[in-house]
Protein backbone atom coordinates (compact mmCIF):
# COMPACT_ATOMS: atom_id res chain seq x y z
CA UNK A 1 0.00 0.00 0.00
CA UNK A 2 2.87 2.37 0.80
CA UNK A 3 4.32 1.92 -2.70
CA UNK A 4 0.90 2.73 -4.15
CA UNK A 5 0.84 6.12 -2.39
CA UNK A 6 4.30 6.82 -3.77
CA UNK A 7 2.89 6.11 -7.23
CA UNK A 8 -0.01 8.53 -6.60
CA UNK A 9 2.45 11.27 -5.71
CA UNK A 10 4.50 10.42 -8.79
CA UNK A 11 1.29 10.77 -10.81
CA UNK A 12 0.91 14.38 -9.63
CA UNK A 13 4.56 15.14 -10.39
CA UNK A 14 4.37 13.41 -13.77
CA UNK A 15 1.23 15.29 -14.75
CA UNK A 16 2.89 18.65 -14.16
CA UNK A 17 6.19 17.59 -15.65
CA UNK A 18 4.79 16.44 -18.98
CA UNK A 19 1.60 18.48 -19.42
CA UNK A 20 3.69 21.58 -20.08
CA UNK A 21 4.37 20.30 -23.62
CA UNK A 22 0.67 20.61 -24.44
CA UNK A 23 0.39 24.02 -22.77
CA UNK A 24 3.27 25.77 -24.53
CA UNK A 25 1.17 27.30 -27.36
CA UNK A 26 -1.47 28.52 -24.87
CA UNK A 27 1.13 30.04 -22.53
CA UNK A 28 2.99 31.60 -25.48
CA UNK A 29 -0.20 33.30 -26.68
CA UNK A 30 -1.13 34.53 -23.19
CA UNK A 31 2.39 35.79 -22.40
CA UNK A 32 2.87 37.17 -25.93
CA UNK A 33 6.16 35.35 -26.51
CA UNK A 34 7.27 32.68 -28.97
CA UNK A 35 6.67 28.96 -28.47
CA UNK A 36 10.43 28.44 -28.57
CA UNK A 37 10.93 30.91 -25.70
CA UNK A 38 8.10 29.30 -23.74
CA UNK A 39 9.83 25.96 -24.22
CA UNK A 40 12.52 27.13 -21.83
CA UNK A 41 10.02 26.44 -19.05
CA UNK A 42 10.92 22.82 -19.74
CA UNK A 43 14.64 23.58 -19.69
CA UNK A 44 14.48 25.53 -16.40
CA UNK A 45 12.51 22.77 -14.68
CA UNK A 46 14.74 20.00 -15.96
CA UNK A 47 18.01 21.78 -15.21
CA UNK A 48 16.90 22.64 -11.67
CA UNK A 49 15.87 19.02 -11.13
CA UNK A 50 19.17 17.70 -12.49
CA UNK A 51 21.37 19.97 -10.37
CA UNK A 52 19.14 20.30 -7.33
CA UNK A 53 18.40 16.62 -6.76
CA UNK A 54 21.90 15.51 -5.65
CA UNK A 55 22.54 18.73 -3.72
CA UNK A 56 19.29 18.38 -1.78
CA UNK A 57 19.98 14.69 -1.18
CA UNK A 58 23.21 15.67 0.61
CA UNK A 59 21.57 18.57 2.46
CA UNK A 60 18.81 16.38 3.92
CA UNK A 61 20.84 13.20 4.29
CA UNK A 62 19.96 12.73 7.98
CA UNK A 63 16.24 13.38 7.65
CA UNK A 64 13.83 10.45 8.00
CA UNK A 65 12.70 9.47 4.51
CA UNK A 66 9.00 9.79 5.37
CA UNK A 67 9.49 13.40 6.47
CA UNK A 68 11.73 14.00 3.46
CA UNK A 69 9.02 12.83 1.06
CA UNK A 70 6.42 15.02 2.76
CA UNK A 71 8.71 18.08 2.66
CA UNK A 72 9.45 17.52 -1.02
CA UNK A 73 5.79 17.18 -1.95
CA UNK A 74 4.88 20.36 -0.03
CA UNK A 75 7.52 22.23 -2.04
CA UNK A 76 6.07 20.85 -5.26
CA UNK A 77 2.53 21.92 -4.32
CA UNK A 78 3.75 25.41 -3.40
CA UNK A 79 5.37 25.77 -6.82
CA UNK A 80 2.11 24.94 -8.58
CA UNK A 81 0.19 27.46 -6.48
CA UNK A 82 2.79 30.07 -7.38
CA UNK A 83 2.24 29.26 -11.07
CA UNK A 84 -1.50 29.81 -10.68
CA UNK A 85 -0.95 33.43 -9.59
CA UNK A 86 2.08 34.12 -11.82
CA UNK A 87 1.63 37.50 -13.50
CA UNK A 88 4.70 37.38 -15.72
CA UNK A 89 6.88 34.89 -17.54
CA UNK A 90 9.82 35.31 -15.10
CA UNK A 91 7.48 34.52 -12.20
CA UNK A 92 6.17 31.46 -14.03
CA UNK A 93 9.76 30.42 -14.66
CA UNK A 94 10.48 30.79 -10.93
CA UNK A 95 7.45 28.67 -10.05
CA UNK A 96 8.71 25.89 -12.30
CA UNK A 97 12.03 26.06 -10.47
CA UNK A 98 10.29 25.59 -7.11
CA UNK A 99 8.33 22.64 -8.50
CA UNK A 100 11.54 21.07 -9.79
CA UNK A 101 13.23 21.32 -6.39
CA UNK A 102 10.37 19.40 -4.82
CA UNK A 103 10.17 16.84 -7.61
CA UNK A 104 13.94 16.36 -7.68
CA UNK A 105 13.98 15.60 -3.98
CA UNK A 106 10.88 13.38 -4.08
CA UNK A 107 11.33 10.98 -7.00
CA UNK A 108 14.76 9.44 -6.24
CA UNK A 109 13.78 9.10 -2.58
CA UNK A 110 10.49 7.44 -3.53
CA UNK A 111 12.23 4.90 -5.77
CA UNK A 112 14.76 4.19 -3.03
CA UNK A 113 12.00 3.62 -0.48
CA UNK A 114 10.13 1.33 -2.88
CA UNK A 115 13.27 -0.75 -3.37
CA UNK A 116 13.95 -0.87 0.37
CA UNK A 117 10.53 -2.33 1.19
CA UNK A 118 10.40 -4.78 -1.76
CA UNK A 119 11.88 -8.28 -1.87
CA UNK A 120 14.92 -8.69 -4.15
CA UNK A 121 13.04 -10.62 -6.83
CA UNK A 122 10.33 -7.94 -7.01
CA UNK A 123 12.51 -4.84 -7.08
CA UNK A 124 12.09 -4.31 -10.82
CA UNK A 125 8.31 -4.35 -10.41
CA UNK A 126 8.47 -2.04 -7.38
CA UNK A 127 10.42 0.50 -9.42
CA UNK A 128 7.96 0.09 -12.29
CA UNK A 129 5.00 0.69 -9.94
CA UNK A 130 6.41 3.98 -8.66
CA UNK A 131 7.44 5.18 -12.10
CA UNK A 132 4.07 4.04 -13.44
CA UNK A 133 2.62 6.99 -11.54
CA UNK A 134 4.48 9.23 -13.96
CA UNK A 135 3.58 7.19 -17.02
CA UNK A 136 -0.08 6.93 -16.04
CA UNK A 137 0.07 10.70 -15.71
CA UNK A 138 0.89 10.83 -19.40
CA UNK A 139 -2.18 8.64 -20.05
CA UNK A 140 -4.69 10.63 -18.00
CA UNK A 141 -3.16 13.75 -16.48
CA UNK A 142 -1.39 15.14 -19.53
CA UNK A 143 -4.22 14.96 -22.11
CA UNK A 144 -6.83 16.06 -19.56
CA UNK A 145 -4.58 18.87 -18.34
CA UNK A 146 -3.94 19.93 -21.91
CA UNK A 147 -7.66 20.08 -22.66
CA UNK A 148 -8.36 22.01 -19.45
CA UNK A 149 -5.58 24.45 -20.29
CA UNK A 150 -6.95 25.02 -23.77
CA UNK A 151 -10.52 25.52 -22.53
CA UNK A 152 -10.11 27.25 -19.16
CA UNK A 153 -6.57 28.63 -19.36
CA UNK A 154 -3.20 27.20 -18.40
CA UNK A 155 -3.57 28.42 -14.80
CA UNK A 156 -6.43 25.96 -14.30
CA UNK A 157 -4.09 23.10 -15.17
CA UNK A 158 -1.59 24.11 -12.49
CA UNK A 159 -4.45 24.42 -10.01
CA UNK A 160 -5.52 20.87 -10.87
CA UNK A 161 -1.98 19.61 -10.30
CA UNK A 162 -1.88 21.36 -6.91
CA UNK A 163 -5.07 19.52 -5.92
CA UNK A 164 -3.57 16.21 -7.08
CA UNK A 165 -0.47 16.94 -5.04
CA UNK A 166 -2.54 17.69 -1.94
CA UNK A 167 -4.39 14.38 -2.35
CA UNK A 168 -1.10 12.52 -2.63
CA UNK A 169 0.22 14.38 0.42
CA UNK A 170 -2.76 13.23 2.48
CA UNK A 171 -2.12 9.66 1.39
CA UNK A 172 1.53 9.84 2.39
CA UNK A 173 0.71 11.35 5.77
CA UNK A 174 -1.58 8.46 6.64
CA UNK A 175 -0.25 5.61 4.49
CA UNK A 176 3.53 5.81 4.68
CA UNK A 177 5.19 4.28 7.74
CA UNK A 178 7.80 6.11 9.77
CA UNK A 179 11.21 4.82 10.69
CA UNK A 180 12.40 4.45 7.11
CA UNK A 181 16.21 4.28 6.92
CA UNK A 182 18.22 7.43 6.40
CA UNK A 183 20.98 7.75 3.85
CA UNK A 184 24.42 7.50 5.48
CA UNK A 185 26.52 8.26 2.41
CA UNK A 186 28.86 11.21 2.67
CA UNK A 187 29.43 13.82 -0.02
CA UNK A 188 32.75 12.18 -0.84
CA UNK A 189 31.08 8.82 -1.33
CA UNK A 190 28.45 10.35 -3.61
CA UNK A 191 31.13 11.96 -5.74
CA UNK A 192 33.04 8.69 -5.83
CA UNK A 193 29.98 6.86 -7.15
CA UNK A 194 29.50 9.54 -9.80
CA UNK A 195 33.14 9.18 -10.90
CA UNK A 196 33.01 5.39 -11.20
CA UNK A 197 33.40 4.48 -14.87
CA UNK A 198 30.55 1.95 -14.96
CA UNK A 199 28.14 4.41 -13.37
CA UNK A 200 29.28 7.21 -15.68
CA UNK A 201 28.47 5.06 -18.71
CA UNK A 202 25.00 4.40 -17.31
CA UNK A 203 24.38 8.09 -16.59
CA UNK A 204 25.55 9.10 -20.06
CA UNK A 205 23.20 6.52 -21.59
CA UNK A 206 20.26 7.89 -19.62
CA UNK A 207 21.12 11.49 -20.55
CA UNK A 208 21.30 10.69 -24.27
CA UNK A 209 17.98 8.83 -24.15
CA UNK A 210 16.29 11.73 -22.35
CA UNK A 211 17.79 14.33 -24.69
CA UNK A 212 16.41 12.54 -27.73
CA UNK A 213 12.96 12.07 -26.27
CA UNK A 214 12.49 15.64 -25.06
CA UNK A 215 13.88 17.14 -28.25
CA UNK A 216 10.69 15.82 -29.83
CA UNK A 217 8.19 15.74 -26.94
CA UNK A 218 8.68 19.35 -25.84
CA UNK A 219 7.60 20.69 -29.23
CA UNK A 220 5.43 17.78 -30.40
CA UNK A 221 2.42 20.07 -30.75
CA UNK A 222 4.21 22.13 -33.44
CA UNK A 223 4.48 19.46 -36.18
CA UNK A 224 1.08 18.10 -35.18
CA UNK A 225 -0.52 21.51 -35.67
CA UNK A 226 1.22 21.65 -39.02
CA UNK A 227 -0.69 18.49 -39.97
CA UNK A 228 -3.96 20.15 -39.01
CA UNK A 229 -4.32 18.79 -35.47
CA UNK A 230 -6.53 20.94 -33.23
CA UNK A 231 -6.38 21.07 -29.42
CA UNK A 232 -8.54 17.96 -29.09
CA UNK A 233 -6.42 16.05 -31.63
CA UNK A 234 -3.22 16.99 -29.82
CA UNK A 235 -4.70 15.77 -26.54
CA UNK A 236 -5.56 12.52 -28.31
CA UNK A 237 -1.95 12.20 -29.51
CA UNK A 238 -0.73 12.79 -25.95
CA UNK A 239 -3.19 10.14 -24.77
CA UNK A 240 -1.79 7.68 -27.32
CA UNK A 241 1.73 8.43 -26.12
CA UNK A 242 0.68 8.08 -22.50
CA UNK A 243 -1.01 4.71 -23.02
CA UNK A 244 2.07 3.46 -24.85
CA UNK A 245 4.37 4.80 -22.11
CA UNK A 246 2.36 3.01 -19.42
CA UNK A 247 2.54 -0.25 -21.37
CA UNK A 248 6.25 0.22 -21.99
CA UNK A 249 6.93 1.01 -18.34
CA UNK A 250 5.28 -2.17 -17.11
CA UNK A 251 6.92 -4.24 -19.85
CA UNK A 252 10.27 -2.77 -18.88
CA UNK A 253 9.83 -3.87 -15.28
CA UNK A 254 8.57 -7.36 -16.14
CA UNK A 255 11.14 -8.05 -18.85
CA UNK A 256 13.96 -6.79 -16.63
CA UNK A 257 13.10 -9.45 -14.07
CA UNK A 258 12.75 -12.16 -16.74
CA UNK A 259 15.28 -11.63 -19.55
CA UNK A 260 17.65 -9.14 -17.96
CA UNK A 261 18.14 -5.41 -17.73
CA UNK A 262 20.48 -4.76 -20.65
CA UNK A 263 18.48 -6.77 -23.25
CA UNK A 264 15.31 -4.98 -22.15
CA UNK A 265 16.93 -1.54 -22.21
CA UNK A 266 18.49 -2.24 -25.62
CA UNK A 267 15.17 -3.32 -27.12
CA UNK A 268 13.47 -0.21 -25.75
CA UNK A 269 16.12 2.15 -27.09
CA UNK A 270 16.14 0.54 -30.53
CA UNK A 271 12.35 0.78 -30.83
CA UNK A 272 12.34 4.38 -29.64
CA UNK A 273 15.14 5.53 -31.97
CA UNK A 274 13.53 3.95 -35.02
CA UNK A 275 10.11 5.43 -34.24
CA UNK A 276 11.55 8.93 -33.81
CA UNK A 277 13.55 8.83 -37.04
CA UNK A 278 10.53 7.55 -38.96
CA UNK A 279 8.51 10.53 -37.66
CA UNK A 280 10.75 12.82 -39.69
CA UNK A 281 10.42 10.54 -42.72
CA UNK A 282 6.62 10.64 -42.44
CA UNK A 283 6.50 14.43 -42.02
CA UNK A 284 8.81 15.02 -44.98
CA UNK A 285 7.54 12.46 -47.49
CA UNK A 286 4.07 11.16 -46.57
CA UNK A 287 0.91 12.79 -47.87
CA UNK A 288 -0.75 14.87 -45.11
CA UNK A 289 -3.84 12.66 -44.99
CA UNK A 290 -1.61 9.62 -44.37
CA UNK A 291 0.96 11.39 -42.20
CA UNK A 292 -1.63 12.02 -39.46
CA UNK A 293 -2.29 8.31 -38.95
CA UNK A 294 1.36 7.36 -39.37
CA UNK A 295 2.40 9.92 -36.74
CA UNK A 296 -0.03 8.49 -34.20
CA UNK A 297 1.29 4.97 -34.81
CA UNK A 298 4.88 6.15 -34.47
CA UNK A 299 4.08 8.10 -31.30
CA UNK A 300 2.64 4.87 -29.87
CA UNK A 301 5.77 2.84 -30.76
CA UNK A 302 7.99 5.61 -29.41
CA UNK A 303 6.13 5.62 -26.09
CA UNK A 304 6.44 1.87 -25.61
CA UNK A 305 10.13 1.72 -26.46
CA UNK A 306 11.15 4.87 -24.67
CA UNK A 307 9.51 4.03 -21.38
CA UNK A 308 10.54 0.37 -21.40
CA UNK A 309 14.11 1.63 -21.12
CA UNK A 310 13.90 3.59 -17.87
CA UNK A 311 12.79 0.88 -15.38
CA UNK A 312 15.30 -1.50 -16.98
CA UNK A 313 18.07 1.04 -16.52
CA UNK A 314 17.03 1.72 -12.92
CA UNK A 315 16.83 -2.01 -12.15
CA UNK A 316 20.34 -2.40 -13.54
CA UNK A 317 21.61 0.20 -11.07
CA UNK A 318 19.81 -1.59 -8.23
CA UNK A 319 22.23 -4.50 -8.69
CA UNK A 320 24.83 -2.35 -6.98
CA UNK A 321 25.24 -2.59 -3.22
CA UNK A 322 22.34 -0.89 -1.32
CA UNK A 323 24.11 2.35 -0.37
CA UNK A 324 25.61 2.71 -3.83
CA UNK A 325 22.35 1.91 -5.61
CA UNK A 326 20.46 4.66 -3.78
CA UNK A 327 23.10 7.20 -4.78
CA UNK A 328 23.19 5.87 -8.34
CA UNK A 329 19.39 6.11 -8.64
CA UNK A 330 19.51 9.75 -7.56
CA UNK A 331 22.28 10.46 -10.05
CA UNK A 332 20.35 8.59 -12.76
CA UNK A 333 17.32 10.81 -12.19
CA UNK A 334 19.58 13.85 -12.43
CA UNK A 335 21.04 12.51 -15.68
CA UNK A 336 17.53 12.05 -17.05
CA UNK A 337 16.52 15.61 -16.26
CA UNK A 338 19.81 16.98 -17.52
CA UNK A 339 18.91 15.22 -20.76
CA UNK A 340 15.44 16.75 -20.60
CA UNK A 341 17.03 20.20 -20.28
CA UNK A 342 19.33 19.56 -23.23
CA UNK A 343 16.38 18.23 -25.21
CA UNK A 344 14.39 21.39 -24.56
CA UNK A 345 17.29 23.51 -25.80
CA UNK A 346 18.01 21.23 -28.77
CA UNK A 347 14.38 21.18 -29.84
CA UNK A 348 14.20 24.96 -29.78
CA UNK A 349 17.35 25.22 -31.89
CA UNK A 350 16.03 22.68 -34.39
CA UNK A 351 12.77 24.59 -34.74
CA UNK A 352 14.60 27.87 -35.28
CA UNK A 353 17.31 26.63 -37.64
CA UNK A 354 15.72 23.68 -39.47
CA UNK A 355 12.03 23.01 -38.90
CA UNK A 356 9.44 20.82 -37.15
CA UNK A 357 9.97 17.87 -39.49
CA UNK A 358 13.61 17.60 -38.38
CA UNK A 359 12.85 17.12 -34.69
CA UNK A 360 12.33 13.36 -35.06
CA UNK A 361 15.55 12.34 -36.75
CA UNK A 362 17.70 14.49 -34.51
CA UNK A 363 16.01 13.11 -31.40
CA UNK A 364 16.28 9.60 -32.81
CA UNK A 365 20.02 9.98 -33.38
CA UNK A 366 20.48 10.90 -29.72
CA UNK A 367 18.56 7.79 -28.63
CA UNK A 368 20.57 5.69 -31.10
CA UNK A 369 23.76 7.05 -29.50
CA UNK A 370 22.41 5.92 -26.12
CA UNK A 371 21.87 2.44 -27.56
CA UNK A 372 25.40 2.35 -28.99
CA UNK A 373 26.85 3.36 -25.62
CA UNK A 374 24.78 0.73 -23.81
CA UNK A 375 25.87 -2.04 -26.17
CA UNK A 376 29.49 -0.87 -26.04
CA UNK A 377 29.61 -0.92 -22.27
CA UNK A 378 27.39 -3.95 -21.59
CA UNK A 379 26.70 -4.98 -18.03
CA UNK A 380 27.59 -2.69 -15.16
CA UNK A 381 30.33 -3.63 -12.79
CA UNK A 382 29.28 -3.99 -9.15
CA UNK A 383 31.71 -1.86 -7.13
CA UNK A 384 32.12 -1.92 -3.37
CA UNK A 385 31.33 1.26 -1.44
CA UNK A 386 34.61 1.17 0.43
CA UNK A 387 36.55 0.55 -2.78
CA UNK A 388 35.18 3.48 -4.75
CA UNK A 389 35.09 5.84 -1.78
CA UNK A 390 38.52 4.99 -0.49
Predicted regions and their residues:
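Helix-to-loop junctions at the C-terminal end of transmembrane segments
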Residues: 53-64, 248-261, 351
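Extracytoplasmic
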Residues: 5-38, 53-56, 216-221
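Conserved MFS/SLC helix-loop-helix module at the cytosolic interface between two early adjacent transmembrane helices
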Residues: 51-90
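Cytoplasmic helix-loop-helix junction between adjacent transmembrane helices
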Residues: 89, 95-134
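Paired small-residue
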Residues: 75, 79, 90-98, 290-301
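C-terminal transmembrane helical hairpin of 12-TM major facilitator-type secondary transporters
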Residues: 263-312
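Helix-loop-helix hairpin linking two adjacent transmembrane segments in secondary transporters
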Residues: 91, 119-175
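Intracellular juxtamembrane helix-capping segments at the cytosolic ends
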Residues: 105-118, 307-321
Amino acid sequence: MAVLWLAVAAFAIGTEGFVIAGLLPVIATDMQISVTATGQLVTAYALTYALGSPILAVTFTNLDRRNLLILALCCFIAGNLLAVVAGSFPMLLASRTVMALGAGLFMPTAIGVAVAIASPERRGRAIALVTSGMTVATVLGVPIGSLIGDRYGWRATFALVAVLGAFALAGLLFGLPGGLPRSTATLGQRLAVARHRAVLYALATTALWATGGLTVFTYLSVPLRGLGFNAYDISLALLVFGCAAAIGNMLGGLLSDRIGHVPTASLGLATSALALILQSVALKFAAPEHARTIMLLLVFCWGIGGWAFYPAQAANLIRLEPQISMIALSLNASAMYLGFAMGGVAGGIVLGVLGPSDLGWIGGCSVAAALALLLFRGWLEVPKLGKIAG
